[in-house]
Regions:
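Short, small-residue-biased leader/transition segments that mark boundaries at the very start
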Residues: 1-9
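Conserved P-loop NTPase
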Residues: 3, 13, 74-77
């Protein structure tokens, strides 16, 4: 079942329960759900992130899957004067923290010329929406790209996003929830998405109208 369909079913359930309570309490004899009353019943619409307007070094757009469907997320990285400590915030689970450590090790090996930056500064990795728990390995490629952007000082284009687990040797491994993630990317204004090569078969489950609006590049 797609994330969009799941969301519709959840909202229908809320409407039915709302109507049942009103009828049982005798507050109303019948209930008509009009377009104007939807906000009264369901509240305001869900807020979805949009791509960055002004990209900066160290910040890259990733893709996540949640129980509510796909979402984009931003990986933010920065250096501050220090002695090499690593600070990770944003309510990340153990698996995602391990992905961050793998990304750090990989970037150090890819850019030995910037080794002093890691020694002479503290590294802060943050994933916004700190009240929302985040976990899983699929942000690996995004973490590597964000750290690469930080050490080189080159911002990643705002219209790109990515998803994929990364190994210590730099390989990109498959992830789950690709249809939902691509739907979220297209909704947010992303134009170009990098996905694991091993997930190419999953594109058969992605709606044509989503694929038509995205340039999708497989990586290994």
């Amino acid at each position: 079942r797609s994330s969009a369909a799941s969301d519709v079913y959840k909202r229908q359930d809320v409407l039915c329960r709302y109507a049942a309570v009103k009828l049982v309490k005798g507050e109303q004899k019948s209930i008509t759900v009009s377009e104007k009353r939807v906000a009264e019943f369901l509240g305001h619409g869900i807020h979805h992130e949009k791509i960055l307007e002004n990209p900066v070094p160290g910040v890259v757009t990733g893709l996540a899957w949640t129980s509510a469907g796909g979402e984009i997320l931003f990986i933010e990285t920065s250096f501050t004067k220090g002695d090499g400590k690593v600070i990770i915030t944003g309510q990340l689970g153990d698996v995602m923290k391990e992905s961050a450590q793998i990304a750090i090790t990989l970037v150090k090996s890819l850019y030995p010329e910037f080794a002093d930056k890691f020694k002479e500064n503290d590294l802060h990795i943050h994933v916004p929406a700190g009240a929302v728990p985040k976990d899983g390995p699929s942000a690996g490629i995004t973490l590597v790209t964000a750290l690469s952007s930080l050490v080189t000082g080159k911002p990643a284009p705002a219209e790109i996003a990515m998803t994929g687990e990364v190994s210590l040797r730099g390989g990109v491994m498959p992830i789950g929830g690709l249809p939902e993630k691509l739907m979220a990317a297209q909704r947010a204004g992303v134009k170009h998405v990098f996905i694991p090569y091993e997930n190419m078969d999953d594109l058969d489950d992605v709606a044509d109208e989503v694929k038509e609006k995205l340039e999708i590049t497989p990586v290994t």
